[in-house]
Amino acid sequence: MSDTIRSPAGLLVGAFKNLFAPGAAKSTTVSSQFRLTPGMMLNGVQLNNVTAMQYSAVWACIHVLAETFASCKCYLYQKLPDGSRRRAVENPLYDVLTYVAAPNMPAYYLRETMQYHVLSGGNAYAEKVLDSKGEVTQLNMLLPVNVLPAQDYNTGEIYYNVNDRGKLYKLPAEKILHIPGLGYNGVIGYSPLAMARRAISLGMSSEELGNKFFENGALATGVLETDKPLKEDAWQRLKEQFRARYEGRSNAGSTMILEGGMKFNRISVNPEEAQFLETRKYQTEEIARFYRVPLHLIQNLEKSTYSNIEQQTIDFYQNTMLPWFVRWEQFMNCLLYTSDA
């Protein structure tokens, strides 16, 4: 029996409550507690799938992984009596996997988007459309937020509650192509964004600090000195004029005009004040570590050389992409299997 924990979103459970009428089979939602929930705040940053993707390191890692995965062609093969194989081009599933997954949905785009779903939320879903012979003729992508896996207490059967634009229905497991990421219960995967939420929030906080750092022309670059005492009204007038003329990005580089024997002495930014730059670099590496993406693939060439980039790229395909290819291949063989394929 699977752990009974709360659903990814209370609204979704509310939408599905009518499906579990009195007398229905007792069931439990099979949902991961490690996911980003609406309104989640961490380090003063609102963190969800949308805001996390606005962090450049997250976008770059997911982008390169999803595009690289989708760029590799997917073919359906038929086993022959002599043990060899050939492409099963006459099978409807061949075109679904290789060319067009559904109306207005190229196979490339289906793979790319579903891989993004796995890399962000930990799970990707598509509904199988079958013909009269039971062959898969379409794969209709489902948004993970609209799918709630559940398990029957008595039989252990997995099924899926789906909310399609307000239309609620159940689908048996054999009608769903479900690609989970790394998980703990054998059904669903952890959300990578949720697992990396502290690293992401720290990176986003450092970006916010950088925005504020430069918002008013960065930190003070110098001080005004005078040998004459200033009265309160003169001091207030000086502050107001200085802010109006020299603060802000639009006034950056303006020529400073001083009066009354005042002098401007430049000061440098101390290491503590500039530390956020190092924090931003480290957080980029931290996100790349979560996704096992070499830094040069997300445009960070600081530690790369001509000789090691080639080896890093080979390692990327062997240690990062190959597990994804195997995962998809085996789940598709299990869930899209046809007798002659």
Predicted region positions:
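Conserved nucleotide- and phosphate/pyrophosphate-binding catalytic cores
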Residues: Y317-Q318, L322, N333
